[in-house]
């Protein structure tokens, strides 16, 4: 071989891998598909197993929903941000709640001090919820609420406000995250032990089936699993394992699979590795369709469809050279779109530093609008299909996820896998491996371990006025002083009674809310009966 050819054949690395550590071939050909029928014949969009998308015409009929996640400080402050985003072309709302709201504590709880309105909006009562959606008719928008341990309470608050607006409950559209299992393995905002928490999940399924037919009763979330450090394969596997557990719990509670499965939805991370991420979404869709058909004998085609929201990867954003995050977010969003998402949130450039400013949030929204209107990727359906690389990686991820699912089944299911610490340990190992790769410069991160700036330029960031917490606490105190305490206490007593039976909890929660019971009071009523989850130490 000539010196020129030898130089041309020399590669940059000895081994090429995806960001998750999966090997990447030098060249993908038809032989890379290895006779895999699904890879060689990916089928058509809108047809089982939905590798190419869940709808026949995908974005040629309707673009994905641009649903920017927002919420901070008080309900009034967040309402201003929602109305601003809607005025700029956003089509759906996505609500971020503060930590006290997420774990069932009122804003005046001692442990809430310093956290009120910090990472999301503070919601204590129906009055706060009414302010949050003031001037926004709830039967004209779809709303996603990222809430889990207190999902039943926040859903009932939303319904109570809709009733006050005179909206038809049959027209309410949206999603409540309601995915408690991932809290035990990745995020930590749990309250109750696993058993009672799963009971609340299935109560929501059953109640919404009749009361809110257009509502998505759960968003089974891989996003936080990936943010905790998992690989793409683990994100698919552990998310679908959670999904299997929820379906089985609903069946055990007496629900028929096709009565609730069409309202299941999913939430995935859109990370940096473009090809791996596109393939990940396709693999998840195909695998879920097969699980629902083969394992649960679902007959309704909608029960087989993995509908998903995506959010760009917060953990990939860097505090160093934060303007670079605009590019990261743009590429991640492109992966989600090419992977066939139904809705998308694009992170803001400043989120490694603080909650997003209004200007940063607008750039994030404009990123989606540019992808939709200027790149042409939405003009044809599943343009990546047939790529040897994409189809091969799709099958590789599906096979890896199946292996994890088999292991979880052997452990007795996802609940047992969580309680034994298996899932947490697997995620921790992957997180360690990734961080080590960054620190040894095997994994390059621009601005962090390569192409660093000698002096970092500061950008404007959002700060929350501490006075807003005092104002929130004062409003809560005023609510308690003016409500009919006897009626409130009576509704909480009814909730306690129901919680000791198998009766559905949501009618009692709604009644308590309409009588001005607070998020903390309702949560404490259930704590008194169910107890609190004690985390296992996983080494």
At which residue positions do the language-model features occur?
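Catalytic alpha/beta active-site cores
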Residues: 2-271, 276, 295, 302-309, ...
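Generic secondary-structure signature for well-ordered alpha-helical cores
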Residues: 87, 91, 134-138, 160-168, ...
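Flexible glycine/proline-rich, aromatic-decorated loop/lid segments
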Residues: 256-260, 298-312, 320-349, 356-381, ...
